[in-house]
Amino acid sequence: MAGSSGQQGKGRRVQPQWSPPAGTQPCRLHLYNSLTRNKEVFIPQDGKKVTWYCCGPTVYDASHMGHARSYISFDILRRVLKDYFKFDVFYCMNITDIDDKIIKRARQNHLFEQYLEKRPEAAQLLEDVQAALKPFSVKLNETTDPDKKQMLERIQHEVQLATEPLEKAVQSRLTGEEVNSCVEVLLEEAKDLLSDWLDSTLGSDVTDNSIFSKLPKFWEGEFHRDMEALNVLPPDVLTRVSEYVPEIVNFVQKIVDNGYGYVSDGSVYFDTAKFASSEKHSYGKLVPEAVGDQKALQEGEGDLSISADRLSEKRSPNDFALWKASKPGEPSWPCPWGKGRPGWHIECSAMAGTLLGASMDIHGGGFDLRFPHHDNELAQSEAYFENDCWVRYFLHTGHLTITGCKMSKSLKNFITIKDALKKHSARQLRLAFLMHSWKDTLDYSSNTMESALQYEKFLNEFFLNVKDILRAPVDITGQFEKWGEEEAELNKNFYDKKTAIHEALCDNVDTRTVMEEMRALVSQCNLYMAARKAMRKRPNRALLENIALYLTHMLKIFGAIEEESSLGFPVGGSGTSLNLESTVMPYLQVLSEFREGVRKIAREQKVPEVLQLSDALRDDILPELGVRFEDPEGLPTVVKLVDRNTLLKEREEKRQVEEEKRKKKEEAARRKQEQEAAKLAKMKIPPSEMFLSETDKYSKFDENGLPTHDAEGKELSKGQAKKVKKLFEAQEKLYKEYLQMPQNGSFQ
């Protein structure tokens, strides 16, 4: 034994060598970078922290679907980076509340309000409109842009139409209500025309800075309400140009000190030639082919900054304003160069530079901002920081068209966010955006929205069906069921789809592919549930719940499902917060079972009135409460909580279909009745009389009433005689049937 023991000690067993699996290279996030026009691996500068600046709106009018295109798309990208890829995103957005458009619109609104307060007489109004039409006509003739020309022509036409009734009323010396009504119509139609004219003549007299702050403050509030309604997350920090004027002045001064800016007549301009000639810098990084495009550059400078005297202040036409000397009728702030206001491009540079420093990870904006706005932002910021990497990744969202056309007020396809939300929910709009690439053109049309509505309905039905399965009572161990081949196959498909979705998100956040993969996964689940139902077997609860939870999680990440956030611990401990479904469903289940019992008795006892009441509960009462009862043949009632408006819409569509069927049935019955009446009327005619009234065809008849001569007195040919004989015999048969009808009771 001792020897044996020693043997064991000598040959002691040890664990075999272990080798890690080869594995696969993890998929990395790539983003389409406008600086390279390629998809690049996304590598933040500081670990998982991501600094992100997004160009916000210029707030002088209602937000429209073009704004929604950018802000919903960036909201989706931000959520995916934060909640899916788990980056620590610091998101900054600006509000442009000092701008040429704002100044002009504020002055126009103020002057038009003053004009209305004076209550101009009809004759004076007509005189003013004619005066305003003169410069307007010159502007119309000089306009070459077809969309803008169409808009101006429409304004001119509508003003002329509104002018005529008032001119006639004045000529006829009408007074009172009739004239006042014509005045109101003309004031409404000529508002833009008169506002522009008043601004050109009196705009320089507007000096109160509060007039220029009132307008953007109002529209900023409307913008935030629109974003909240669209479920767009608010930025981590919001910057307003009006609150950063001192920082902008300092930013401009340093650019001048670094040799890239120059002062001219109280304004400060960026020296593009000096910057481009520097070995450290490049001008026009985003759209180099657009450098020198004077039309684009002038649009970037603003309507109030492209007069001949302004343009003459520049060393080069390619230079752009960092600071503008204020003219009479423009707001102003003190600075080393005299009273003035910021240029458009410098505003973003100063605010983003103040908060995010010399280099940010992501800068975002709409596609049409690439040049000159973003190229000029890059230039002046890199001139300030003396670097070549102010932005690492530039993301630009695609255009939005309206039913294939460029969005334009002149084409009457300018849709505000509020108007869009009257037709479709925020979720439906977001689903439409998710079903398209964020960087490509999106066509906002009835077809696009119908696809989104169908997708929403498709997913919702799946979630409702899974909820119904999960509500089926089981004991605590019964919720874990043995898997068969069908469950194993569905689970494999589930993990395959998760991989495909991850790869799509890594590929420039390709939500379009993600949505298709999710649709395919739901289709596989539907086939599985249908097969189990056909076999009278219960689907696997845990598997379907896992898939439904995953899909819900993804939709929450995309912002398609809202989550209520709360601070701190829930009141009353965990699990006590109100959940409508878990609270209401037990009561609905009791109601459903009671209704089933009542229906069973009503069918057995043949009480149709009770069955009708039961159907009315299902079809008329419960939908008003957002509850759907489904009565599948031979199976228990399925209870679903659905959005009330969705159910009411479904009910209305069902009623319309039924009404259409009823109308078609009535129409068919009416046609049948008319045909029978016509047939009866024909049957009543004795064959001997059937041709006698046709004097336009025949002139002579035999003793039986058969025609022998045509209308011109010529004897009928053999063929014609044979034809009328055949008609005569057919009528003879019909008349015979008619005479027999009272005897056999066919007609009463």
From Swiss-Prot:
Motif residue range(s): 'KIIK' region: 101-104
UniProt-recorded name of the protein: Cysteine--tRNA ligase, cytoplasmic
Biased composition regions of type Basic and acidic residues, renumbered to the chain: 654-679, 700-717
Residues noted as binding ATP in the record, renumbered to the chain: 409
Protein residues bound to Zn(2+): 55, 348, 373, 377
Gene Ontology MF term list: ATP binding; cysteine-tRNA ligase activity; metal ion binding; tRNA binding
Keywords carried by this UniProt record: Acetylation, Aminoacyl-tRNA synthetase, ATP-binding, Cytoplasm, Ligase, Metal-binding, Nucleotide-binding, Phosphoprotein, Protein biosynthesis, Zinc
Oligomer status and interactors: Homodimer.
Motif ('HIGH' region): 57-67
EC number(s) per entry: 6.1.1.16
Free-text remark on how the cofactor is bound: Binds 1 zinc ion per subunit.
Source superkingdom: Eukaryota
Database matches in InterPro entries: Cys-tRNA-ligase, Cys-tRNA/MSH_ligase, Rossmann-like_a/b/a_fold, tRNA-synt_1_cat_dom, tRNAsynth_Ia_anticodon-bd
Region named Disordered: 1-25, 654-686, 700-721
Alphabetized CDD domains for the sequence: CysRS_core
Residues reported in the UniProt entry to bind L-cysteine: 56, 96, 373
Motif ('KMSKS' region): 406-410
Modified residues (N-acetylalanine): 2
A biological-process GO annotation: cysteinyl-tRNA aminoacylation
Pfam families xref list: tRNA-synt_1e
Reactions mediated catalytically: tRNA(Cys) + L-cysteine + ATP = L-cysteinyl-tRNA(Cys) + AMP + diphosphate
